[in-house]
Amino acid sequence: MTPFWVLKTEKAPASAVLTEDTLILENRYIRRVIDRKTGLTVSLTDGDGTEAIARSIREGAVSVDGTGYILENPSEILIREGSLTEKKFEYIPKPYNTHPYPYPAPGKAAEITYLRDALEIRVLYEIFDNMPVLRKSLYVTNHSDHTVTINTAETEALCLNDTGKLQLYLETDYTGNNGSGFQWNTSLFRDEDIMSARFDMGPDYDLQAGGTFRGMQVYEMFCQSTCFEHRMNEVQNMYRRVAPWVCEAPLFLHLISDDSKELRDSADMLADIGYDMIIQSFGSGIDLENEDPAYIERVKNDYDYVHSKGLTIGGYTLAIIRDYRPMNHDCATNGDHNQISRCLCTKWSADYWNRVVSFLAKTGSDFIEIDGPYHFYTCTGNKPGQAEHLHKGLADSRYSQWLKSTVEVTAKMKELGIYINAPDWLYLSGTNKCGVGYEEIAFSQPRLTQILMNRIYNYMGTYHKIPSMGWSFLPVEEYHGGGAAAKFEPLTENLAEYDWVLAEAAASGVWPCVRGKRLYDSELCRQVVKYWTDVIRRHKKLLNSNTVHVYPPKPLKELQTAEDIDVILQENNTTRDKLFLMVCNQTERTITKQLLLPAFYTGLTTLERPHTAPKSGSFDDVTIPGFGSWPPVYPENMENLLEEAVPAEDSGVHMALFEHDLPEKRTEAVIDTNGNLLLTVTMPPMSYTYYVGYAAEDMPEDPIPVPEGKPFGCRLIREETLPETEIKNAVSDICQIPRFCVGVYVT
C-alpha cells in the first residue's frame, strides 16, 4: 500500500513519457494513460493501481460559431523538456509563509494539439512531484483572419466508476460561491457517471484573429482516504503546493484610521509586539483610487515609515456597490442583481483597476483588501447613462468579469508582490485569504458570545481551508453595533475576554481582523498580547498545519455558554512541536473528561494511513446559530466510510504533553493502536488551557514565561450564577490570584 502522501517526506518525482501507443503521466501516487491515436484517457489509477474511470469518452469539447469540436484524434503530442509546469505569475514567498513550497510546483508537462479548421486547440497536462495531483488546461488560438465566438468550452470529461466517484477530487480555478468553495453546476457537472468541467453559462467569448482563449484549469487529485476529515487535509495539502501563497500567515491590525500620526503610532506598537502587517481597512479613509500626487507622496512617506519598522502595509478598496458608496452614472450595474454590484468588465472597471494597481506600485504597498469581485455575478449589458461595457451581454458577462477582474488583475498585483484579501474563493487565481466563514452581525453580540462563535466558525471553516486561508473578527472598536458589551475596548478592563479571544485565534491559526487603533492600553495588557504573539511565532508552522476536528463547540440557547468541553487540535509531523491542543470549558460547571484525540498527523503513530475517523459528532452535529440573513455556508460533509475512533490498546508509543509549553508541566500520554492519544483533563468552569506535544524524549526549549497577572482565559465566570466560594475555588484551582473576573479582580 502506498503511504499516506500528506505525511510522506520522501520524493515522488513525476514523469511524462511517450511510448509507441500512449502518453503516460505518473508519479508514485497517480497515473494517467492517454492513447496516442485517439487522444483519449484510457486509464486513471492511484499508486496502488486502483482504477477510477469506467470507460473512455472524450477529453473535452469546444463549440465555436455554433460548430462543436470533440477533443479526440490529436494532431500532435509533445513532452515539455525539463520540469516546466506553468506559472501564472512570479511569486516569492514572504517571511510569514509557514510552508514556502516552490512555485510553480515542480513536475512534468505534456501538450496535445488538435487542429480544427483555422483553430488550434491545445490541452496542457501537468503532473506534479510528490502529490497525487494532475492539472489540465485548455487553450484555443484563432488562426483565421476574422473574429470567432467561443460558445462553450469543456476542459475535462471523465466517465468514473464507483471508486472514481468516491476518491477523485476535482476543483477548477473558475470557482467562488462567496467564500465557501466550489459548488456543483457552476464549473463541475455530474451527469450519472460523467464528470464534466465546463462553464455553466457561455463563455460566449469573442476571440479576435490571432488571439488565444484561456479556458478554466482543472485540478484532479486521487484521494487516498474516504473519510471527510482526512480527505479535506489532502485538499489543503494540495493547496499548499499548487498555491503556496495561501500559507502566508501575517499577524495584522485592521487599522481604522488614515491619520499619519495614528498610523505611525500603530506601527510602533505592532513592531514592539512582533506583528507583521497593518491593514488600513474599510472605514479608515484610505483611498486607493486617489491619483493626487500630494496624497500619494504622503501615503508613501507613511508606508516608508511602516517599512522601516519591519512591517508590511496596505489598504482597502471597494470594487462593488454598497449603501455607503452608491452607483454613479459612470458605474455600470449587474442588471440581474438589483444594483448591488458594478459590472467589472467595463471601461470604468478597467480604469478603476489601473488606478488601484498604479497606487499600489507608487506607494510601495504590500497588501490590498478588495471588496469584490464576487464570482458568478452576471450583467445584462449596456444601459443608457452607464459606462461602456467590454462584454456583449448576459451570456459572456460571467466569464468576461472573471477573466478581467480576477485572473488578469490578480496576476498584475502578484507581480508586485501584493498580499490579497478577497471576499471570495479565488485562491487558485492568486488571492491569499477570504473569510473563514462567519456572519458579520455575530461580532456585534456580547463578548462571551463572540468568543464561542469564533470557535464555532474556526472549527467549521478549517475543514476546507488551511487556517491562513481564512480570517475571522475581533472588534476592538465597535463593529455593526452592540455597544460597550460587544467591543473589547477598554482592553485592560475587558482583559479576561480579550485574552481568551486571542488565545483561541492563536490555537486555531485563523487570525482575526483585530479592528481598531491599538493592541493594548496598559503594560498588563501589553504583556498578554505579547505572550500570545510569542506563542504564535514559536509554533507558527504547527499552527498552520493539519487541523484535526474533534469535540466541537456546541452552544446552549443563550449563546454565552457551551454544552461541554470542546477542543482545538493542530498537528505536524515535520516539526519538533508535534501537537498543539487547546481545551475549552465555556460552561458553568467543573468537568473531568477523557479526551480521545486522533494523533495520526503527528507522525508518531504506528500507522501508514489513517484507518479510523475522528470521534462521532465532529461535523454534522454542530449547530451554527444565525443572527441575520447572511449565515455562513460550509461544504457538505461526505459519507464516512471509516470506523469511528474508540479507545484501543497501548501501541507502545507515548507523547509528552506540556501544559502552557512549560517543562515543569509535563504529562505523558499514551497513543493507542488506532493512533489516538488519550488525555484526561479536569477543567474549572469558564476556563481554557493549552498543551504542546512532543515526542516522548523531547521537551520545550527556552519556554515563554507566563506574564504576571495573565487571566489565562479561565476567569470569565459570571458572578451572578455561582456562589462566591465556588468562584474563588475555580480561580485558584489553576493559577495564582489575583485574576480577572468579568473585568474586576477576584481576591
Residues covered by each model-derived region:
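Non-catalytic positions within long, well-ordered alpha-helices that form the structural scaffold/packing
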Residues: 271-272, 360-361, 506
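Active-site-proximal substrate-binding groove within the catalytic cores of carbohydrate-active enzymes
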Residues: 26-28, 39, 44, 405-664, ...
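C-terminal beta-strand-rich structural cap/linker in extracellular carbohydrate-active enzymes
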Residues: 670-746
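Conserved structural scaffold segments of CAZyme catalytic domains across common CAZy folds
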Residues: 72-330, 335, 350, 510-513, ...
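Acidic-aromatic substrate-binding/catalytic surfaces of carbohydrate-active enzymes
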Residues: 2-7, 20-99, 107-109
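Aromatic- and carboxylate-enriched substrate-binding clefts and catalytic-loop regions
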Residues: 281-481
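Trp/Gly-enriched beta-strand surface patches
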Residues: 161-212, 617-670
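Short acidic, Pro/Gly- and aromatic-enriched capping/linker segments at domain boundaries
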Residues: 5-23, 189-208, 676-677
